[in-house]
């Protein structure tokens, strides 16, 4: 899952779209192509999904305002995969089936959650339907690792790869926080709590392997996702173990941050750490009065650390000016949608300027090299991964003006925001 990151200036983004995707203006419009979106957008999950949706909408607006690509304009075909406020794999599959049933939808942005991607990829792969996730971080979606309980080739069922992502993976994100906890926070003994999901278990595993390699010790417990509301027995066990911190592998809609709200009452008030699943406004809200000293990673670079970021962030905030319209993966979604539209433009050009097939779009997307996006230049490999390996670390703090923050801020306590602390670049380490 990543936070707002910057691009080269907005006008350059439009120029690159023209150069890589075909003509952006002139001639008569040939019709409208739909970009599917599947994200969790209701209930507790909305704090992650809606800002991500806005990133896609902003990318579509940017391309359309520049005249479209190869005579085509674009529109968003949006689907919510949340059920009762939490992401739902079956709903995600239904959404993808609906997209595939609409011949105007040539690819999709999403899903947000790795468990949903695991369920959707087999359906989309059979239709040669491009998926680009702005936030999936479970490595097993693309990498056949010894620790994986499933295999990427099985998800694709013998079909060519149709799945791509613009973030790095938990086999980098987990170790980054392990290093930060051990070296920066001086935590040598830690509690590890997992929500038992594809994402939560995977990132907790990656964290604890690295933490142990550094010389730390840990105690691990798992809980059953969104059905868990009382964490006091877990916290008491961790306290008795002597843990100096708590790392949670999970997401806010699976109650990962409810545990934070119960730590003081159990006398276990230590630093709270996790992955991008807790880098949300909902997490800060769920933590209640114990909303400071929450440490989270994000699977990409921060906007404040990327040259030229300010221009695109300012432009985005003018288009989407709500206090919670900028989320952890807004700009990744912008990049993902721009990459997809450019691939569609190239496919149309190669098809004589005509509407391309989904397979032609898949081929164009698979051939994407040197795509200049908001957080850097992307080159996708045969599995759909990119070569940007940056992980950022954030901590919740009280800020003077949330409107100027590039971090995610709380809803109930709007001056509590995630503030950037450090980044790890695993491509150069």
Region annotations inferred by a language model:
Residues 24-37, 65-73, 182-188, 355:
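Immediate post-signal peptide segment of exported/extracytoplasmic ligand-binding proteins
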Residues 105-222, 271-296:
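Extracytoplasmic ligand/sensor domains, especially the bilobed periplasmic-binding protein
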Residues 29, 33-57, 79-89, 112-113, ...:
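Extracytoplasmic "Venus flytrap"
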Residues 1-34, 65, 100, 420-429:
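Short, low-complexity disordered leader/linker segments with a strong preference
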Residues 316-330, 341-408:
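Segments of small-molecule ligand-sensing domains
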Residues 48-69, 205-210:
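Short, polar/charged alpha-helical segment
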Residues 21-24, 28-30, 47-51, 66-151, ...:
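Beta-alpha junction/loop-to-helix N-cap segments that form part of ligand/metal-binding clefts
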Residues 260-334, 346-351, 416-427:
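Extracellular/periplasmic periplasmic-binding protein-like sensory domains
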């Amino acid at each position: 899952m990543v936070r707002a990151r910057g691009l080269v200036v907005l006008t350059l983004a439009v120029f690159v779209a023209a150069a890589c995707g075909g003509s952006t203006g002139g001639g008569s419009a040939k019709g409208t192509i739909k970009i599917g979106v599947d994200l969790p957008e209701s209930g507790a999950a909305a704090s992650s999904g809606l800002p991500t949706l806005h990133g896609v909408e902003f990318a579509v607006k940017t391309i359309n305002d520049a005249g479209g690509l190869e005579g085509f304009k674009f529109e968003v075909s949006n689907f919510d995969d949340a059920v009762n406020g939490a992401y739902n794999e079956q709903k995600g599959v239904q959404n993808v089936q609906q997209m595939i049933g609409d011949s105007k939808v040539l690819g999709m942005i999403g899903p947000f959650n790795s468990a949903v991607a695991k369920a959707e990829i087999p359906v989309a792969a059979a239709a040669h339907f491009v998926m680009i996730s702005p936030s999936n971080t479970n490595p097993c979606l693309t990498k056949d690792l010894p620790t994986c309980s499933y295999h990427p080739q099985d998800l694709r069922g013998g079909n060519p790869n149709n799945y791509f992502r613009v973030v790095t993976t938990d086999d980098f994100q987990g170790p980054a926080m392990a290093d930060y906890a051990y070296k920066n926070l001086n935590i040598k003994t830690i509690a590890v709590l997992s929500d038992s999901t594809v994402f939560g278990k995977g990132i907790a595993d990656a964290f604890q392997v690295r933490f142990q390699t550094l010389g730390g010790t840990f105690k691990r417990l798992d809980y059953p996702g969104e059905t868990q509301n009382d964490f006091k027995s877990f916290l008491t066990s961790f306290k008795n173990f002597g843990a100096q911190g708590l790392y949670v592998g999970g997401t806010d809609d699976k109650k990962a941050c409810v545990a934070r709200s119960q730590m003081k009452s159990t006398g276990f008030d230590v630093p709270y750490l996790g992955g991008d699943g807790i880098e949300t406004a909902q997490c800060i809200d769920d933590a209640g009065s114990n909303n400071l000293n929450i440490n989270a990673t994000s699977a990409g670079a921060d906007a404040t650390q990327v040259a030229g970021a300010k221009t695109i962030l300012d432009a985005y905030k003018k288009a989407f000016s709500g206090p919670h319209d900028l989320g952890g993966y807004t700009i990744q979604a912008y990049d993902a949608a721009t990459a997809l539209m450019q691939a569609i433009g190239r496919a149309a050009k190669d098809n004589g300027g005509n509407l391309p097939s989904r397979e032609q779009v898949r081929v164009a997307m698979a051939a994407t090299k040197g795509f200049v996006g908001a957080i850097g230049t992307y080159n996708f490999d045969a599995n759909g991964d990119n070569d940007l390996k940056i992980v950022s670390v954030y901590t919740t703090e009280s800020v003077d003006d949330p409107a100027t923050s590039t971090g995610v801020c709380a809803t109930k306590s709007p001056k509590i925001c995630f503030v950037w602390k450090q980044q790890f670049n695993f491509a150069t380490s």
